[in-house]
Structures are given as C-alpha cells and as structure tokens.
Amino acid sequence: MSDFILELLSEEIPSRMQKQASEYLLREFRQQTEGAGLEVGQIQSFYSTRRLTLIATNMKSQTAKMTVEKLGPRIDSPDDAINGFLRSNNIKSIDDCDILDDKKGKRYRYIETVPAKMAITILPPIIEEIIRKFSWPKSMRWGNGNSRWVRPLRNIMAIIYENNSVNKLKINVEGLLANDYTFGHRFLKNQKIYIKGVSDYFEALTNHLVIADQGQRRELILEQISKIEKKFDISVIKDEKLLEEVSGLVEWPVALCAEFDEKFLNLPDEVLQTSMRSHQKYFSVAEKKTKNLTNKFILISNIQTSDEGNSVILGNQRVLSARLYDAKYFWDRDIDQPLID
C-alpha cells in the first residue's frame, strides 16, 4: 500500500471559492481513479488561502490484471462489419476471436487481457486533466499556455510515498513541472520543504508557519478568541460565516484585540458591525453583562510579529477609523435630511 499527496500552490484563492474547489478536486480524483481501476482507501482534501491539497491513503501500487469481454457482430455479418469490429478493437485477426452462442445467435467474441498498471504511471495524466479542466466560478490564464486557474499556479507537489520512499510524479501543466517539495508561509518562512509522507506534510508545514487543515485553523482561531475574551472580560459576537471566511484568508492565524474611538459608539450597532464585518472582516465585541457593543474588535492576522502584534493592531485601527468617519458622515447627513420636506 502507498500514500499519495497532491498540493496545488497558487496565488491567493478567494475564500468563498476554496471549499467548493476542494470538494471538486476530491470528487474528480475519486471518479478518475475508480474509472482507471486503481483502488484507493481514504481520500481527503484540505484548503487554505494558497493551497488545495488532496491526500489519498492506503492506495494500491498498481491496478489488478483484468480480462475484458468484447462482443462483436454475428458470424454471418458482412465483411465490412466484421473488419470494423477488428479495427476498432485493435484485433489483428479474426482467428484471435472465439464464437459465442447466445440468444442472438452465434457471434464473434474477443477476450482482451489488460495488464496491471502502476499507480505512478496512471496518476500523472489524471492529475493533468483535473488541473486543465478545473471548474472555477472565475479564472484567469497564467503562464504561456491556455490553462486557466483562479490565480496563477506557482507549484505542483505530487508524490507517492511507499516503503519509506518518496517518488515524484512526472506531471507537466503548461511547462510547470511537479516537484517533491512545497513552500512555507509566504511572508514568515518562505522556504522549500521536502515532504516525506502524510504525517510529515502537516508537521513540516506547521514548522514553517502554515496550518494546512482548515478545520484546525478554525479551532485555533476560536481558542485564541476565547483567551482574549477571558483576558479583557468581553464577549465576542458569534458569526459562523465570518469565522469560515477568515479561516480561509490566513495560513497562520493570529487573533488580536484592537479598539476604536469611543465616540463612534453613538452610531447604530448595524452601522458599526457593517463597517467591521463586511468591510474589514473584524469580529464585533460586546460587554458580557449588558451585551452592548464596546469599542473593541477582534482581527485575525496572517502574520506573527516581534512586537506582539502592536504594529498590526495600529494599522488596522487606522483603517477602521477612516471607515467609521465615513460611516458617521453619511449617518449624520441622513439624520439631517428629513424623510418628508
């Protein structure tokens, strides 16, 4: 048995497209391998802002040897029909066929022996076809060819791990050749990582500041938010859709608590939350007892800084302040303008 790892590393994938793309990759791989007669145990897919990963474990190293029955025309059929059957099935001579006597009468039959094929030769054309025909809501051409991807594709890692040995697949998509390595966090640890197996994949990426499992990133964000809630005695307003979105925007999530000027609390909650959630992807914060909004908010950063996030906090506070000044201007103007003159 062997394991297979495929990672497609690209520029940032929009968060809203990641889950659908991951499911498509898994579904296509399963259908293609089943069609090729390659037995695979468990297939899982993972996604992040830059990666689509597929892992197949307990995969057979080769397909089973098979025999395929091909039924031809009746023995009294015209020569053109018989010769057409031979040509379409690459049969050298009618002598290679036997005669089957069934309800339709006597007809020619050819028994083809299909030899076993190695997984390392079956998978490359499958992966190339999946990549070339990948279904994206929106896509762009990249490189010098005609292939399309949601953002430029930068690296393909495709390896089979068997008997403590790593074998790289020979894949070529518009000149982009498959490798046996990936890369760490784009800004924090952008180094080559040679992968030695499934367990090593996740561990090696974590050591290079990438959480490849979307579920693990989600749980990590929740844990960090919970610690902030206890530290500041606040209650972060639950937002599952926002949580799902920000989990797809980062590879190394760092939750930080920031704040805005209290004077903006005079704005309606809906205005504040729209400015924070829709525009900036921030979590709103309420007081534990009163449930009223506070001037604090939670942001999820994709980098870990040496100043404990202070520079990131200040930058985000400036951006939100500008948003809230705009919101206050339009709100005040609407208040001054009566509905009926």
Question: Residue spans of the language-model regions?
Answer:
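Long, basic N-terminal domains or extensions that often function
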Residues: 1-292, 302-304, 319
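Function-dense linear segments that define catalytic or interfacial modules
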Residues: 284-341
